[in-house]
Amino acid sequence: MKDPIGRPVRIVSICFREGTKSLSEIATIVDREAARGCDLVILPETWLGTTPEPLDGPAVTTLRALAHQHHTYIVSPIYRLDGKRRLNSAILLERDGQIACIYDKGYPYWSEFDLSTTTSIGNDAPVYAADFGRVGMAICFDVNFPEVWERLAEQEAELVVWPSAYSAGSSLQAHAINHHYYIVTATGTKHCLAYDITGEKLLNERSSDLHISRLTLDLDRGIYHQNFNMEKRDRLLRERSKEVFQEKWLDDEQWFVLKAKRHGFSARALAKSYGMEELRDYLRRSRREIDRMRGGPFPRKTAARG
């Protein structure tokens, strides 16, 4: 990409029903799409079917070779065989084909415990520092459990990839609104959704058979609250008008979004140099300081009845 503005990441989401495409078919599609140029390819949840494979099995081995050949990241979610354990895993492959990060589904769906080998439960949601930004993963039923998404935000995720059997819709939008990271899906419903750091829907595409979506996101866009930022913002936009601009103003939420205008400049770095605090940091600091004044965190669980 020649002289990019901001921090763009080119994403390909490939959506199809679990077990309906062979490894050879998917390898051909990934090869073709990656050859067109992209930074990240995403496949849907357990795309191979219910038979688990080890990390040195044919699926991961084939996709590792394609990641290396095309110098692209790939997320391959499969049932992973780890010794005698089955895990529902999203495997992030680096541009050189190495395994960068593995997320094991923290909240498997109930039917996953009824398979011939029951599905083991993941314990954490890691975030990986890719060359384009910080990437986290969650899978399908995880969408219903806020702690997974909070954990990703705690680790400064900028993009969350969500492979799934279904679409989820506004449930995902809520997480984008609350945590201000991008969310991109690859689903078995042949439906791709993408949500902005503002929570706005960026993409909503589907097909009757296999569906492929392509989109580019700028991970350098920054979102801010009006509180304590307006004078600093005004000075930034006045003094650095050639490098950064206000892309969005969300009046009801009292938020605004800054974006770079020129190659070689970061909107978020410039805003920070002017003393501006990003929205996620502002809310985190507010929670920490108000909890300290209270004498402890606000209660999150209600005592069991009975």
Spans of model-derived segments:
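N-terminal, active-site-proximal structural segment of metallo-dependent hydrolase catalytic domains
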Residues: M1-R32
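C-terminal beta-strand edge segments of enzyme domains
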Residues: V127, K190-G306
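Active-site-proximal beta-strand elements of phosphoester/diester hydrolases
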Residues: P8-T20, R134-D142, V161
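Eukaryotic scaffold repeat domains enriched in small/polar residues
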Residues: G19, R36-D39, V143-P146, R305-G306
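Active-site catalytic loop in hydrolytic enzyme cores
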Residues: D82-Q155, S170, A174, N178
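CN hydrolase (nitrilase-like) catalytic-core segments centered on the catalytic cysteine
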Residues: L55-V75, V143-V244
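Cys-nucleophile CN-hydrolase/nitrilase-fold catalytic domain and related Cys-dependent amidase chemistry
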Residues: T20-I102, S167, N178
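Short, structured patches in soluble enzyme cores that scaffold and shape functional sites
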Residues: C15, I78, L92-E94, D104, ...
